[in-house]
Amino acid sequence: MTSRRQFIRDLGISTAALPFVSGLPAFADRATVGRKQRIIVMFSPNGTVPAKFWPSDPNDLKTSPILSCLAPFQKQSMVLKGIANRVGGDGDRHMRGMSCLLTGARLHPGNIQGGSDSPAGWASGISIDQEVKNFLQKNKETRTRFGSLEIGVAVPDRADPWTRMCYAGSNQPLAPLDDPYQMLNKLYGQSKDRETYTSILDSLGSDLKKASKSLAAEDQALLQQHIELVRQLELEMQASAKQGKLVHPEPELDPNIELVNDNTPQIARMQMDLLINAMANDMARVGTL
């Protein structure tokens, strides 16, 4: 009997397209029906150690010191090598390497000067994680409280193309939350303030709608983005109120970890634990770190 993967290969589909095409309903395994679909993107801005990352034997992840932890999932894993981000345009390679990674779109012309001759602005398109989030949030069966979580570790305290990987759309960067204690509060904050927050959001949304009537078309478009953000926060509050008993208990974080560079390994572990816990409790099905 021909396997699903072999069947797709026989169709002449490239290896790079295989992970995407194999997830289509027509090619889905019966065993995967009903399973929750999730996507997590992890980005290492300083790269990796090639000699310890790439398996010496492509068919054995145990030959990679870094990937050996995935050995039990060898048959479900695929390691791709040789993919290059060739998006050109304004900005230096570091700016494009971050802001164009998930968008595949050039940076807008702007006034942020990097290490190249031409300054640049934000990415000109939506990132793939947000595209997936929007798709899942449209369906009642796959909708979650947050939709997606944008998490960071030691992200510089500034807003520019070097620090923004996720985009809700053209010129709409999403800031990652790099404080695990703030992330914990976002996920499991006490519900006693919910009514106060809801009241404030209701009032804010109403005021923004009134203001939009007297603005020019360009300003109305920008204000509409703010209105949509308020609406998203309202939906998150409603979902939080409806959430029942947690499948997995709220994680406990060491309260004595300072957010300093020397503690990056511990902070990264805390953020990963929070992301996994949120996924397990179905608060989101899309995450970036």
Where would I find each of the regions flagged by the language model?
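Ligand-binding pockets and gating/stacking loops
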Residues: 1-288
